[in-house]
Amino acid sequence: MKSIFQLIALLCLSIVACMMESCSNKSEKIVLAYVTSHGTTLPDPDIVTHINYAFAHVDSTFSKLKIDNEKRLSEITALKQKAPHLKVLLSVGGWESGRFSEMAANEQYRMAFAKDCQRAIEQFQLDGIDID
């Protein structure tokens, strides 16, 4: 029985050691920039790895995202042509967004929100949604 326990302990330690080595090799840094809808400056895609575009809001019917300045969002996602490694996310919420809690409390509203998030991801070629 003692040898079985020792064998299991050795196996567990081996797995943990492999996991630690695997994690230590991943030293890629994330450089994230928040970009607002009202700005004019674009971040350098050779420096940043991720851009969070601020903001989109839950609309009054809970069925559609209201994206501030869609034209600017398109300019941001166009940077991915120059820098394919770049990830662009749409930040939903923010200080002035008051409808998110209402949407999250209702299953039907959550489903509509999720579908419209998927639409926005496809339409603007986003890499994800950031819930702010």
Predicted regions and their residues:
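Glycan-recognition patch characteristic of GH18 chitinases/ENGases
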Residues: 25-121
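Bacterial Sec-dependent N-terminal signal peptides
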Residues: 1-27
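Short beta-strand and adjacent tight-turn residues that come in two discontinuous sequence segments
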Residues: 10, 53, 131
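Active-site groove signature of glycoside hydrolases
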Residues: 116-132
